[in-house]
Amino acid sequence: MLATSLHHGRREAGCDEAGRGPLAGPVVAAAVLLPEGYNNEALDDSKKLTERQREALRPVVEAVADAWAVATVSAEEIDKRNILHASTHAMCMAVKALLGESVEDVVAGGHMLGRTHPEFLLVDGNRFYNETNLPFQTIVGGDAKYMAIAAASILAKTYRDDAMRHLDAEYPGYGWSRNKGYPTAEHYDAIERLGLTPYHRRSFTLYRQHTLF
């Protein structure tokens, strides 16, 4: 069973991202503030769930969360910042939305959005460049340890999958509905046949290894 909090009595938002490894598409991050003590045994690290399970849990998270936000950082911005900075920037964008700030490229909701705010951040991973004034704790494998991070991982993953399906319709032939932009043989073959799109991350060294420029 996942833990409901790190510090009892403190409002903690879970933060996670999806899309650090793909060759194409955005990185998407989510921040979720769950009701204190909320527990749902179905919630888990999104990577351990099937696509159907993730899609079923997304509206559950959105409905039960006091507040949630999902932020998107484009491939172009990833190339400018590098993927680590882009990922943590996306998390901070989502957190700022929970704090009531107006942030572009963010969708947010929750029945307490704007009326309650996080006091502490639980961040999946081991590195975080904090752009907020909130204290935080990085937690390796946090999406398999804490309920709020697991909820954030589900939102980040499902929103990014949606984005890749839309991009697949715009640029058919790369199989993005299936591979979600990750470095599969199908994706490499498509790049060699069709070239790069505006949604490809040109900074990723995998391209150079395949002499695609």
Task: Give the role of each language-model region.
Residues 1-213:
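RNase H-like, Mg2+-dependent phosphodiesterase core
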